[in-house]
Amino acid sequence: AVLIPVQTEYFALEGLALLASTIREIRRRLNPRLGVDAVVLTMHAPTLLNAQVASQIRETFPDLVVDPPVRRNIRIAEAPSHGVPIHVHAPDSAGGRDYLELAISLAKRWGLAHEVDE
């Protein structure tokens, strides 16, 4: 299964279409069971363009988009420079909370909810 992170930006939308095409080709030629399991919206900002792109992604992949979208947040960008993940660097930041909620959503989606302590 494939999990696709995608920025809510126009060029990322084009890249998502190319990736979907590549996955279809791999399925046809090599692995008929390969499929997209989830699409995660990342680097999301409260702009009209981001909202429009997110809406288009949701329309194209209605059962695959997992909430919440991960908001654009400086703490996420800082974490790798400190050599730690966001949940260590700034767990209470918007990005830290978004990734925690996303992990819980994915665990529920994959039937691992009994292993998640909310």
What are these regions, as identified by a protein language model?
Residues 1-74:
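Conserved catalytic-core segment of NTP-binding enzymes
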Residues 24-27, 103, 107:
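Generic structural signal for well-ordered alpha-helical scaffold segments
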Residues 57, 99-106:
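Hydrophobic "lid"/C-terminal helical patch
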Residues 71, 77, 87:
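Nucleotide phosphate-binding site architecture
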Residues 80-101:
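C-terminal boundary of histidine-terminating zinc-finger modules
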Residues 111-118:
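C-terminal helical "lid" subdomain and adjoining coupling/linker elements of P-loop NTPases
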